[in-house]
A protein has these predicted regions:
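Boundary at the C-terminal end of the N-terminal hydrophobic targeting segment
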Residues: 33-35
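Amphipathic alpha-helical packing elements
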Residues: 40, 45-73, 79-80
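N-terminal secretory signal peptides that target proteins for export/translocation
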Residues: 1-15
């Protein structure tokens, strides 16, 4: 079923959200931000993602390597929780409807923010976008920017009455373009059709009407998804519990820590399978010196001597 034209009806709208106010303050405070209501310049993108250690897309968005994204697919939400201790406690969003609960979503965030439509603002936005050489400003403006490995992340302020931002045709385009999927803090439509696609998707509800009564406020800018702050280029990890948005500079650290966890879990279950120990003797960590040594030897074998020594140095830095 085709998605209907992007409407700007002058009817009652949901309350203006605090995130929009904060975004307006943020954009107003950025030097040389005039005319950049829709997206950051490359320089601004680099400034706000300065800790990114990887390559970038032409627009400045961080480009975490595909090889690292493959490793993220082996992670669970619990294994990403370590970023909370690194100053990022607001990177997880839950309470979703999940398109295919057994299929993980991994990719780089391309963000788009919407607000309840206000005609005078929308008219100026559309005119400025046209002056920059853009076409009709709509949700498809952001969708057409997607690259392989991207995740379409849409901040629709959790609204359901404003209709479904994508139906089966646009969902199919997202799937075939990115190979990943979408996170939509709002509604989708054509769920029966979308469910036939082998893609990952997270959304709040499904509803028949097409999107209306909203306007694009920004593309590839910070957005709020649930209780998470999402930056363009964040690595998206969705599993059965919810969605994590991982800052690029922490991705490798998370992956490395998860490898240790996997090895520990493997050893723990091996010991449980022996049927000789109470759970508290093995999990969370063994206390018996012989078992401690056995685990350390197992870890060293799995990691290799060099990586094991590096891990132990980080775990117990010299005083």
């Amino acid at each position: 079923m085709s998605n209907q034209p992007f409407l700007q009806a002058r009817t009652n709208v949901p309350a203006f959200r605090l995130c929009g106010l904060l975004l307006a303050v943020l954009i107003a405070s950025v030097p040389d931000a005039s005319g950049q209501i829709f997206t950051w310049t490359r320089e601004q993108m680099i400034r706000y993602t300065a800790q990114n250690p990887y390559e970038r897309f032409p627009d400045g968005r961080p480009k975490v390597p595909d090889s690292l994204l493959e490793k993220v697919k082996d992670l669970s939400a619990e294994e990403v929780l370590v970023i909370a201790g690194r100053g990022y406690p607001n990177q997880f969003a839950d309470g979703w409807q999940i398109l295919h609960p057994g299929k993980k979503l991994v990719g780089r965030a391309l963000t788009v923010q919407f607000m309840p439509v206000r005609t005078d603002v929308a008219d100026v936005q559309a005119a400025e976008w046209k002056e920059k050489g853009g076409g009709r400003l709509s949700h498809q403006t952001a969708i057409d920017m997607l690259q392989p490995g991207d995740v379409f992340v849409a901040d629709l302020f959790g609204s359901i009455p404003t209709g479904g931002i994508i139906g089966d045709n646009l969902a199919y385009y997202i799937w075939k373009t990115t190979g990943a999927g979408f996170v939509i803090d709002g509604a989708i439509r054509d769920l029966e059709g979308i469910s036939l696609f082998d893609m990952a998707g997270y959304f709040r509800a499904a509803t028949p009407p097409a999107i209306h009564n909203v306007m694009v406020a920004g593309i590839n800018i910070p957005v709020r998804i649930g209780n998470a702050t999402v930056m363009p280029g964040d690595v998206v990890l969705g599993d059965r519990e919810g969605v994590y948005f991982i800052p690029p500079h922490l991705v490798k650290e998370v992956v490395d820590a998860a490898e240790i966890t996997h090895i520990h879990d493997e050893w723990t279950r091996m010991k449980f399978n022996e049927g000789k120990y109470k759970s508290s003797e093995i999990y969370g960590s063994p206390r018996d010196p012989a078992l401690i040594k056995e685990y350390q030897d197992y870890l060293k074998t799995k990691l290799g001597a060099e990586r094991y020594e590096e891990y132990m140095k980080k775990k117990s830095p010299p005083r």
